[in-house]
């Protein structure tokens, strides 16, 4: 890590502080936390954290490989935009999320925004644009295709566009990633992939056994349960209903509404 202390050199940064156009957060490396205005340089492929110290500005340059943690402040308007997507008002949030993807490049929220942008496009009936937004992220970070927040919506886009072979490869990678969230999300993706070929009784049962029901029964604790179980319970209920097991369907829906009443899946 390099540190530069020079008011003249950082005149542009000072102007940005005055205009308050910065992205704020904390990046931690072996030397400790660096808190201030954060930016990523595409030219040098490094992070910069600028902070005020007395009458000068101190800028720390940090290599990605040296970072132990990163915490970027949530963008203004984020919760409202997410709520619109979850309420089925996806089109109203497209411009917002597109702007966040661009502004927060390599600063955590770009991946999260790309996930909601793809979801918004998909909900608006535009899977091609959803694929475009996912592909832009995956091109820069190939691991995002099978691991992390973007992956599940990327898989839904691939299902919608009939790209089953590509999806199959990504699900295998996710299952082998060692990441519990990605492994669980891959099981839901597996169920979606099975049903993409048709909803016969055989395929509905396979989607349950190989996908949805495994998540509903095995991922029952912590944050991952909140992230994955609502969708798994909802889709399990749908499958049970379609194969004529109304009692099991009611059981799944009852558990969904009791444990996750605020989930969009509980309100469908």
Name these PLM-found stretches:
Residues 18-142, 149-160, 169, 175, ...:
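Compositionally biased alpha-helical segments
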Residues 212, 227-236:
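Surface-exposed aromatic
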Residues 164:
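Mixed-charge (Asp/Glu-Lys/Arg
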Residues 108-110, 142-150, 179-186, 218-228, ...:
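Boundary/linker segments of alpha-helical solenoid repeat arrays
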Residues 1-4:
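Positively charged n-region of N-terminal signal peptides that target proteins for export
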């Amino acid at each position: 890590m390099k540190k530069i202390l020079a008011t003249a050199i950082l005149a542009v940064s000072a102007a940005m502080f005055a205009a308050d156009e910065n992205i704020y957060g904390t990046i931690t490396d072996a030397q400790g936390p660096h808190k201030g205005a954060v930016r990523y340089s595409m030219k040098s492929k490094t992070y910069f954290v600028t902070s005020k110290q007395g009458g000068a500005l101190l800028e720390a340059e940090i290599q990605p490989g040296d970072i132990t943690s990163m915490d970027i402040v949530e963008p203004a308007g984020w919760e409202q935009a997410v709520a619109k997507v979850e309420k089925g008002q996806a089109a109203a949030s497209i411009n917002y999320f597109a702007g966040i993807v661009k502004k927060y490049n390599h600063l955590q929220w770009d991946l999260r925004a790309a996930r909601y942008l793809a979801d918004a496009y998909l909900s608006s009936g535009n899977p091609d644009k959803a694929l475009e937004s996912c592909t832009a992220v995956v091109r820069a970070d190939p691991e995002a295709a099978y691991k992390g927040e973007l992956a599940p919506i990327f898989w839904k886009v691939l299902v919608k566009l009939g790209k089953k072979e590509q999806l199959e490869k990504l699900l295998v990678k996710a299952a082998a990633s060692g990441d519990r969230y990605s492994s669980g999300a891959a099981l839901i993706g597996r169920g979606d992939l099975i049903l993409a070929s048709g909803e016969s009784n055989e395929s509905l049962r396979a989607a349950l056994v190989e996908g949805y029901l495994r998540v509903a029964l095995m991922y029952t604790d912590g944050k991952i349960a909140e992230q994955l179980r609502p969708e798994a319970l909802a889709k399990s209920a749908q499958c049970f209903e379609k194969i004529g097991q109304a009692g099991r369907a009611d059981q799944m829906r009852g558990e969904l509404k009791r444990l996750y009443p605020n989930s969009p899946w509980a309100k469908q």
